[in-house]
Amino acid sequence: MKKSSKRSSIRRKDWLLSVVKIWGSCILVIVVITLILFKFLEPPPPTDLKIASGSKGGAYYQFAVRYKSALAEHGIKLEVLETQGTIENYSLMKSGKVDLAFIQGGCVEIENDSPIQSVASVSYEPVWLFLRKGFKLDDLRELLNKKVNVGTEGSGTKALAIRLLQMTGVNEGNCQFSYLSYQDTVTALKNSELDAAFIVASINSQVIRDLIADPKIMVMDFKRAAAYTYKADNLSHIIIPQGVIDLEKNLPKEDFSVLSTSANLCSSSTMHPQQVELVLSIMAKIHGEKDLITKKGYFPNAEFVE
């Protein structure tokens, strides 16, 4: 009887030991899997993002509003920040205050260790130089001692205009610069208070179309546009065909050349990869259509990203 009891006790001990070993192995596996998940799996992407755009009347702001609607369909809330433009957008991105920003090509230098990454170029942005009536201009060097509006403070227009002028020896010391808004610029040109004004904007912009149609204002033909593109990789030479804006009214009245930069969308390097992919798919729908100077499907692309 004692032997039977002893054997039974041994069997129970063996069974308990087996159970402990099995459960111990299970717990060990669970712990290992949990550690792996914590180490390699990223947390879910946030549902709130911020984008630095531009002024309310500009293309960047309108693009951002369309992004907001598209992202809302995927449960993401996008806050659109109105800004002065590229320079302010770059500053907001660099300080980590926004997740996305539109930055005009060639205005800022994004370094390799920067917290900013270029996603894609989204459109051409021609450089228009509008002139008061009667002021004929063939070369930027002829702007010496003239009254020239170079765009508002903090804008990509100002940065690019000053850069182009400096390439031809024109600067604030030998030229009268002003920093007016679009509307004030148009008024000043019509009143002959300015000799010339730089505007960087899409050909689809109503401001550009109105200026080209205005008989009191002329637009410069950048005859040396090709030469500038060899001096700066982020500039393109584009020909605006006669009649492309309005065939019936024949606007513009003749072909002319412009320089063009690009509008680029940039993101924070810490932005969740899934969200970057989602934004790319939205960009293809918004920017993939053709316009007066761009073929369908040309944008978005990586040709002009920095």
What is the role of each PLM region?
Residues 1-85, 94, 112-115, 123-124, ...:
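N-terminal hydrophobic or amphipathic helices and topogenic motifs
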Residues 43-44, 121-122, 140-142, 255-260:
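Short, flexible turn/loop "capping" segments at secondary-structure junctions
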Residues 46-74, 125-191:
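Bilobed "Venus flytrap"/periplasmic-binding protein-like clamshell domains
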Residues 50-52, 79-81, 100-103, 118-121, ...:
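Soluble periplasmic/extracytoplasmic beta-strand elements of cell-envelope proteins
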Residues 71, 75, 97, 102-105, ...:
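Sec/Tat-exported extracytoplasmic proteins
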Residues 84-127, 131-134, 202-207:
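Acidic, polar ligand-binding/catalytic clefts
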Residues 105-107, 135, 172-260:
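Pocket-lining segment of extracytoplasmic ligand-binding domains
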Residues 248-306:
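Segments of small-molecule ligand-sensing domains
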